[in-house]
Amino acid sequence: MKRIAFVFSTAPHGSASGREGLDALLATSALTEALGVFFISDGVFQLLPGQKPDAVLARDYIATFKLFDLYDIDQCWICAASLRERGLENVNFVVDATPLEPVALRRELGNYDVILRF
């Protein structure tokens, strides 16, 4: 079976991209365990706790990331450079994601056959 990477690179609530990516990820996890999840650029904001999407009339889907354990999604990485650029190095995120420097992250991403970006 092909290995599938889900890359979240956009901030939450400005568009439906993050929510759609999360829905696709959870649906795909029912079919395969060969999944990897990557958070890069503004996608690191997807994992911030305490968001208030109702203030912008958006649906609160961020809590759904906490279901990764239930869906056996354990290959999760976050770009260390993106965290530094946004001052988020010492934040407790809603999921456990391993920080990787950009070179290591690209190397890990290269291990996947299909890359879906949201």
Curated annotation (Swiss-Prot):
Record InterPro entries: DsrEFH-like, Sulphur_relay_DsrE/F-like, Sulphur_relay_TusC, Sulphur_relay_TusC/DsrF
Annotated keywords: Cytoplasm, tRNA processing
Pfam families: DsrE
GO BP field: tRNA processing
Coiled-coil ranges from the UniProt annotation: none
Assembly, per entry: Heterohexamer, formed by a dimer of trimers. The hexameric TusBCD complex contains 2 copies each of TusB, TusC and TusD. The TusBCD complex interacts with TusE.
Family recorded in the similarity comment: Belongs to the DsrF/TusC family.
Function: Part of a sulfur-relay system required for 2-thiolation of 5-methylaminomethyl-2-thiouridine (mnm(5)s(2)U) at tRNA wobble positions.
PANTHER family linked to this entry: PROTEIN TUSC
Protein name listed in UniProt: Protein TusC
UniProt organism field: Salmonella paratyphi B (strain ATCC BAA-1250 / SPB7)
